[in-house]
């Protein structure tokens, strides 16, 4: 695995009700948990992401891909990939997917966020994905 070139990215933990968000600085040194987006229509979600991306000068997106224990796609992973690709195209940003298997469980344990309905758990999971991406990659792909 190749460590990606550091840049300001958003990491997304895409769920049916909320999208957890974490971001990093352009050097990839600090990771910030951001407020989760409570999902609505794609158009409303997009407006929120446009503002976040503008404010943070985002250069790419990392999306969690919830593969099963064997690394195979699931119904949820297919939905996440479709959403991530559509969002990246609309925002004109490169995109990378990272296996998010057990990221929510890890976030629950690491940040003591059991039974959270506020979105903090989702954003904590996004932060774990971002930390994993900063170490392992893959590089962002702008061919979306």
From Swiss-Prot:
Pfam families: RuvX. Keywords: Cytoplasm, Hydrolase, Nuclease, Ribosome biogenesis. GO terms for biological process: rRNA 5'-end processing. Its EC number is 3.1.-.-. One of its GO terms (molecular function) is nuclease activity. SUPFAM superfamilies: Ribonuclease H-like. It is found in: Cytoplasm. Signal peptide: none annotated. GO terms for cellular component: cytosol. It comes from the Bacteria. Its main location: cytoplasm. Belongs to the YqgF nuclease family. HAMAP family: Nuclease_YqgF (MF_00651). Could be a nuclease involved in processing of the 5'-end of pre-16S rRNA. This is Putative pre-16S rRNA nuclease.
